[in-house]
């Protein structure tokens, strides 16, 4: 890890949404970049709708209240998310707020959905 110092300040994860699924509405101090690997949908950033599809990259600005939503009724959506969150944690700038929790029930017709095992 001596050669990977820059990676210590970047957090990366993959989100998978069932067809028609969506994540929680939330905000955090750190910015984020996400790359759409599969699917199509839109984000809401501070009330503004931003459509996206596979191959697109989006930036979530610092302190932006946002939500990711899949618009594909037939196929899952997969996004790669990258954040400088470890750096913000180190600086004690850890404010993160859930504005609206994700649904507890799956989207209609997606009761048996499971994220791909290959992720």
Where are these regions (language model features)?
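A short glycine-rich, His/Asp/Glu-containing loop-to-beta-strand
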Residues: 1-25, 31
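A generic structural signal for short, solvent-exposed coil/turn residues
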Residues: 4-9, 35, 44, 60, ...
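Residue-level detection of beta-strand scaffold positions
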Residues: 10, 52, 75-77
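Conserved metal-binding segment of the jelly-roll/cupin
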Residues: 17-18, 45, 52-72, 82-85
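A short beta-strand-loop-beta hairpin characteristic of the jelly-roll/cupin
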Residues: 27-54, 64
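A generic membrane alpha-helix/interface feature
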Residues: 38, 44, 56, 94-96, ...
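Double-stranded beta-helix
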Residues: 67-119
């Amino acid at each position: 890890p001596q050669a990977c110092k820059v990676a210590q300040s970047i957090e990366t994860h993959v989100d998978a949404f069932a067809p028609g699924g969506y994540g929680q509405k939330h905000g955090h101090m750190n910015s984020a970049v996400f790359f759409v690997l599969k699917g199509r949908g839109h984000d809401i950033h501070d009330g503004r709708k931003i459509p996206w599809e596979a191959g697109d990259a989006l930036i979530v600005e610092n302190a932006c209240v946002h939500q990711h939503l899949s618009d594909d009724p037939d196929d899952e959506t997969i996004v790669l998310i990258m954040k400088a969150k470890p750096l913000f944690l180190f600086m004690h700038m850890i404010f993160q707020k859930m504005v609206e929790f994700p649904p507890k029930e799956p989207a209609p017709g997606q009761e048996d959905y499971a994220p791909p095992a290959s992720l």
